Amino acid sequence: MARPGNIALVTARSAGLRGSGQPQGRRQQQAQGQQRSASLPGQRSKEKKKVNCKPKNQDEQEIPFRLREIMRSRQEMKKTLSNKKRKKEAQVAFKKTLEKEAKGEEPDIAVPKFKQRKGESDVAYVQRMEQEAQHVLFLSKNQAPRQPEVQAAPKKEKSERKKAFQKRRLEKAQRKREARAVDRLEQELLKDTVKFGEVVLQPPELTVQPRRSTSRDAPGKKSLMLKKMLLGPGGGSPAPATSLARQRILGEERERAVQAYRALKKLHRQEMTPAQPPGSSFQRQGHACL
């Protein structure tokens, strides 16, 4: 049986150990937490790494990666194919595949030739021969069936109607293209390019005269020297002098024409005025006398 003094001593020692063990455990936990946090890869990547990559040659420095990517993307944008070119390339590729399928001619499977290489062991040589033989057997088994006796179907020629339609279509497209080119040329001729800072001081001068301008010399209106001499003062030829008999005949003809005109006028006036009573003339004379 244990003594009471010994029991008290044991209990005191155990209490002292418990009190002193608590701070040591906390320190150990803190140290383990720091080690775990340092061992995490995310925190390592977050740490800034200072890298000093100096150029090998100061005169020849490389272009930055981002700038190279931008330049490459710009070059690709410039080299982009239009829809027409893409369609054309697709048609050419499709046509080639059709021709290849129509021909149906595939190359024969090459028979391997075996030869032991330098430094190759017998086991490796036999293994290589086995692999190549298995590969040839696989190709021959999975090859498409051939029919060498069957001839290829002849090409269908285009009908005359279809050829004429395509020809008309091409001509129409050519005419449209030419019309667009003419319109574009006219627009360029009508367009006047004005430079920056150009000042206009006067309207443009027309060097070409219109067709119906009065300033131009017409064929019948040219000022010739002979015309000036004829139409100038004293330049015209004098009229021939008429004889006295000729003058008398002309005077008589003129007098006869005047008398005939007067008689015709008088007759016309009498026809226009209505018939009057006989007393009216007497009354008119009386009134005239008064």
UniProtKB/Swiss-Prot annotation:
Region (Disordered): 1-92, 98-117, 139-181, 269-290
Residue stretches of biased makeup (Basic residues): 164-178
GO (cellular component) term, any one: nucleolus
Keywords: Chromosome, Coiled coil
InterPro entries (alphabetical): CCDC137
Subcellular location: Chromosome
Keyword Coiled coil (UniProt): yes
Coiled-coil segments: 66-89, 155-192
Ranges annotated as biased composition (Low complexity): 20-39
Annotated Basic and acidic residues bias: 56-79, 154-163
Protein name per the record: Coiled-coil domain-containing protein 137
